[in-house]
């Protein structure tokens, strides 16, 4: 770690504007950009102060401008500030599994201190170009619509795009559950500016499902790093980096395949824009920070696969007002290998997961990667749904009877396909009352082939709603007829 001074370097606060704190240091003893500074003491009203701030700008006149990682309430001008001589560091390694940390790597789950084998700074360089792994392989999730139409890349970056309340967090929780039970790898979850209640629910569900082993934390499969909605923007801006640092250690030192979940990448951008104006930067398009591309790039370029191990990242991206051209989601798009777009229209129909089969994409859906059978089935599903979409206006105006025999058949099959793309989730059992289902890729492909070939034309469409594989749909149809 880089130190900026041989002995303790002490300055004092000259100005406080919300989460932004200006600090003056003695001549020639300025801390470096991104160094962590500590403010510890008691103010005049007897309030204990223990705040970490991060250097963002060198202002001249021996002053630095910093952003606080916790509330600046109770701070006053003249308070002493100590330069730690290094960036914020967080504990890493096996000891982090089953624990919840804040942005500074402090445990917040009332389980005592963490005996970590190492601590690493949250600001690090991306892996060298020559160290990157480029062989594409598919990552099975057990979710039909994802595996068929937007297959995820092992070591890739996937975005879950959707407006408020369409199910981003639920899909993410299902993926964590499926991966922990089916693949057995380690995961890191970074909660960036989302609801504290959701963070708490996620933690409790993981204990229930055994992903976090309460009796023996070392056997847990996930480490959690939270910087929730009520935290100041500094914490929300950096908590993604703290989570990523934990994941990088598992990849680089333990040589493991890691899953990194970030919920929500938009809040990371939003925190940056909150801080940006206070740092005196001119806002850019729609009020975002002018450094939007750089901020997102610094985070995304570190999430990658090397020859030692991989980080597969699944990132929820809130889409403001359902507008995918907003600068925040649009900038994120450029970094992703796959996009899973959630549709409010499908959610309104009660089709969950509400993944838009025509709007979602994946660089993996190529015959030389997934094979001809998978590719042709996926494309046939999409063209059937596309034709159904084109016919909907005619149906709305003239009714089904005015369609040709062939088109009526396409509509009937498309409605079955649409319903078969829904699936009961393990993490949603409490709400739906249906047990969750993990569907293997070959069963998914077989099921859709049977629907499209006309083999199941006689079955009612409701038999395909919220089931696992095609055999369940056939059994459900028997039940309905019976």
UniProtKB/Swiss-Prot annotation:
Would you identify the family this protein belongs to, as annotated? Belongs to the ATPase alpha/beta chains family.
Q: Name one GO molecular function term.
A: ATP hydrolysis activity
Taken from the UniProt entry, a GO cellular component term is: plasma membrane-derived thylakoid membrane
The identity of this protein, by name, is ATP synthase subunit beta
Per UniProt, subcellular location reads as: Cellular thylakoid membrane
Give the EC number. 7.1.2.2
Under CDD domains, the record lists: ATP-synt_F1_beta_C, ATP-synt_F1_beta_N, F1-ATPase_beta_CD
Q: Give the organism, scientific name.
A: Nostoc punctiforme (strain ATCC 29133 / PCC 73102)
Which SUPFAM superfamilies does UniProt cross-reference here? C-terminal domain of alpha and beta subunits of F1 ATP synthase, N-terminal domain of alpha and beta subunits of F1 ATP synthase, P-loop containing nucleoside triphosphate hydrolases
Reply yes or no: does the keyword Calcium apply: no
Supply the alphabetized keyword list: ATP synthesis, ATP-binding, CF(1), Hydrogen ion transport, Ion transport, Membrane, Nucleotide-binding, Thylakoid, Translocase, Transport
- EC main class here is translocase
Species lineage, top-down? Bacteria, Bacillati, Cyanobacteriota, Cyanophyceae, Nostocales
Q: What does this protein do?
A: Produces ATP from ADP in the presence of a proton gradient across the membrane. The catalytic sites are hosted primarily by the beta subunits.
Under the heading PROSITE patterns, the entry gives: ATPASE_ALPHA_BETA (PS00152)
Broad class of where this protein is predominantly found:
membrane
